[in-house]
Amino acid sequence: MTETFQHYTVMLKETVDGLNIKPDGIYVDCTLGGAGHSEYLLSQLNTNGHLYAFDQDQKAIDHAKVRLAPYIEKGMVTFIKANFRELEAKIKEHVPQVDGILYDLGVSSPQLDEAERGFSYHQDAPLDMRMDQSAPLSAYDVVNEYSYNELVKIFFRYGEEKFSKQIAREIERVRKIHPIQTTGELVEIIKDVIPAPARRKGGHPAKRIFQAIRIAVNDELGAEEASLEQAIRLLKINGRISVITFHSLEDRIVKSMFKEYSTVQDLPPGLPVVPEEFQPELKLINRKPILPSEEELSENNRSRSAKLRIAEKIRVKEE
């Protein structure tokens, strides 16, 4: 199990240390993955501290049970197999509030590297891309059943792909002849459509389409937005939230939500001080995103697009 679940932990110390860990605090890792962040966070806690770890992927949880065994024996870890859009409901089954929450929104390396999961455009595999293997919607369904207009919308909105219409049209043409069943078939369709000059720049030609389909299959942006709203509510005063994103769509959601919650509301004119009820809920710990160090980039190429944003809860909003 451990051999098949190797995952480089992106910005490990920056993300966890940014939470300002209290040894007896209660923390949530919303994206357990390879358990690197969880392991380092647990090493900062005493036996009165506790970590709740979310993942939709049973393989990730099974691996983490081995990696985190010393902390499990001390009763310091609770695993929750669920989408982090259920954050608030699941956490409130255990505790009313927490001291810190972290998100690493990248697909974990094992999911990318296991061919049968269908996340990678480098390996031929069935079109799947489900984070939760029991979920009903797969990449096969999107590619073979979504209308031309739906595909264009997904490719443009989630992949920011300028050849969205041409690719959707070619998918529509091919699937009338036979179902598109594998990642390799989809890659060839994309390569056939994108002009040679465009293929030679901007990374792999299938990158943006695969990202778009993965986001659609897992409703990643909807889940991210819903979960962040819940996370802010769950934090105690002085509790912190760390979020690592890997593409502009994810980062835009974090940036705009943190800005919304850290901005003073419209005030009546002429007030000498900002009244308590107008104070923002969050304080930004870093105005600009934290980026991986040169050392990390040399060790892990997948870190290159990562951005870390951290905020602290400074006020509870009155209902």
Curated annotation (Swiss-Prot):
Species of the source: Enterococcus hirae
Gene expressing this chain: rsmH
GO BP term, pick one: rRNA base methylation
GO molecular function, one term: rRNA (cytosine-N4-)-methyltransferase activity
Binding annotation for S-adenosyl-L-methionine: 35-37, 55, 84, 104, 111
Cellular localisation: Cytoplasm
GO-annotated cellular components: cytoplasm
Catalyzed chemical reaction(s): cytidine(1402) in 16S rRNA + S-adenosyl-L-methionine = N(4)-methylcytidine(1402) in 16S rRNA + S-adenosyl-L-homocysteine + H(+)
Record protein name field: Ribosomal RNA small subunit methyltransferase H
Entries under Pfam families matching the protein: Methyltransf_5
